[in-house]
Amino acid sequence: MSKAKFERTKPHVNIGTIGHVDHGKTTLTAAITQTMAARGLAEFKAFDQIDNAPEERERGITIATAHVEYQTDTRHYAHVDCPGHADYVKNMITGAAQMDGAILVVSAADGPMPQTREHILLARQVGVPAMVVFLNKADMVDDEELMELVELEVRELLSSYDFPGDDIPIVAGSALKALECGCGKDDCDACKPIIELMNQVDTYIPEPERDIDKPFLMPVEDVFSISGRGTVATGRVESGIVCVQDEIEIVGMKETTKTVVTGVEMFRKLLDQGQAGDNIGVLLRGVKREDIERGQVLAKPGSITPHTKFKAEAYILTKEEGGRHTPFFNGYRPQFYFRTTDVTGICELAEGTEMVMPGDNASMTVNLITPIAMDKELRFAIREGGRTVGAGVVSEVIE
């Protein structure tokens, strides 16, 4: 089969398999690529091609992740699968592989297990918007009532973490049987569950809002003044569009102020607008060089606010990853690196947590000494004197 052309016409969605070790995440990933390949919509990736995932470094953290891609009739998917539990934790917290949705794999023979629970919690904390469930190894359960019990258990578990457990689609099947058959036909007992699963993913997981459609936001990287013209802030536009004459806010570090964009330039050329992904300079009306600094953001008025206190999920690097050699305790005071700047913060560990060891993931409440423009799901690094010792994500803004 010739390599499927990357269709720009189909919406693109990032997805991943999550769930307990040995419940069949990688087998399912292989089965999906094979079923879609049989339908002319993907290139087949075998189990061991996916399982021997290369290690990547994201913010100094080593993560093994396999990336596969395939299409359905309506969408183009990039799918991530991680070989180890620790890789999932790191991946979800750092946002290394952005997930617009997830396929939760649960073995029908075992039911939900500790990592099933942990992955659902992480998905909730880091803001994975929706998931679909695949009850794998259904061929090993011949008792209809037992299947129903497992399904009920999964739904209750999802509901307990604020996912709509009653509405989430659950598809039962055997990834291994589908992989062994590989015909990809609608009427095949082995392959049908995979096709049904992908139909559910197509319809139930919402299409992500593109960065360009979100409100304008640009983290300030550098500031300089141009004599006779005013002050220019430079940076990469994170989301949205900014046009000349737009009113914007400067948010974070100090009092929020309003100003008007009097010019946008890119590669020394003047433009009418800048958009998500562009590296631009923004000329600001009536703003002094000292009124604005790295670490602030330019944003659409009212779209983002500065905060000092938030809850977070964090992963703390191991010694081998270049992190700390010792645990830390309540009251730990590292720097939190948001977008373009470090801010000192004080960590309050979750109740019942005495200390956090290198290699742990932890829930904590953080108090920053300076306010930063933030929203739920904002990623950050934890640093000590410029060295990264952890990575985290804002799970809730408090004040």
From Swiss-Prot:
Keyword Nucleus: no
Region (G1): 19-26
UniProt keywords, alphabetically: Cytoplasm, Elongation factor, GTP-binding, Hydrolase, Magnesium, Metal-binding, Nucleotide-binding, Protein biosynthesis
Residues that, per the record, bind Mg(2+): 26
PROSITE patterns: G_TR_1, G_TR_2
Region (G3): 81-84
Annotated InterPro entries: EF-Tu_GTP-bd (IPR041709), EF-Tu_GTPase (IPR050055), EFTu-like_2 (IPR004161), EFTU_2 (IPR033720), G_TR_CS (IPR031157), P-loop_NTPase (IPR027417), Small_GTP-bd (IPR005225), T_Tr_GTP-bd_dom (IPR000795)
Segments forming domain tr-type G: 10-209
Coarse class of the protein's main subcellular location: cytoplasm
Start and end residues of each stretch annotated as G4: 136-139
Region (G5): 174-176
Domain of life assignment: Bacteria
Reaction catalyzed: GTP + H2O = GDP + phosphate + H(+)
Positions bound to GTP: 19-26, 81-85, 136-139
Cellular component annotations (GO), alphabetically ordered: cytosol
Alphabetized Pfam families for the sequence: GTP_EFTU, GTP_EFTU_D2, GTP_EFTU_D3
Membrane-traversing stretches: none
Catalytic activity, EC: 3.6.5.3
Region (G2): 60-64
Listed Gene3D superfamilies: P-loop containing nucleotide triphosphate hydrolases (3.40.50.300), Translation factors (2.40.30.10)
Family: Belongs to the TRAFAC class translation factor GTPase superfamily. Classic translation factor GTPase family. EF-Tu/EF-1A subfamily.
NCBIfam families xref list: EF-Tu, PRK00049.1, PRK12735.1, PRK12736.1, small_GTP
Oligomeric form and interacting partners: Monomer.
Biological role stated in the UniProt entry: GTP hydrolase that promotes the GTP-dependent binding of aminoacyl-tRNA to the A-site of ribosomes during protein biosynthesis.
Protein name: Elongation factor Tu 1
Gene name in the database record: tuf1
